[in-house]
């Protein structure tokens, strides 16, 4: 299935804070992970959310996903004040050509800047990388490994690229005839593994 789609869907700040308050006050939950890939996309909403977390004295610790090109000092400063202790980045590749092919819309330079900013402000980092694209050369893979080594995120994961249905990678893999019908079906997330 298409994992996230192309349309940005946001919850309102009020809706998010109400849920956080319920978790804190009713269940004493104080650790959260904002899983949205686009959490930092809307600067105004991020800052408003952080202000609300602070103003309501929720005293929570949290982690968020972010793109490397949607983080800046003001946003990250507010996030840290509101309890964010780690930002996870989908860096994907250390090769700008691969980034263009997969239409990531980010560069190595932006990854370096984002991780550097987090280190400056004392926010831990988690880097996610992908290797194994059919058009990827050994040198391109080494670029990714070198970038991961250079960035020295607090945590890193390197995954083998999977052509999920509905993605550009799936279309390319099918066009090249390298994808079997059963490799990653349309109901990949619906079927139990065992």
Model-derived features: positions:
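Short, solvent-exposed beta-strand edge segments and adjacent coil->beta transition regions
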Residues: 36, 128, 191-193
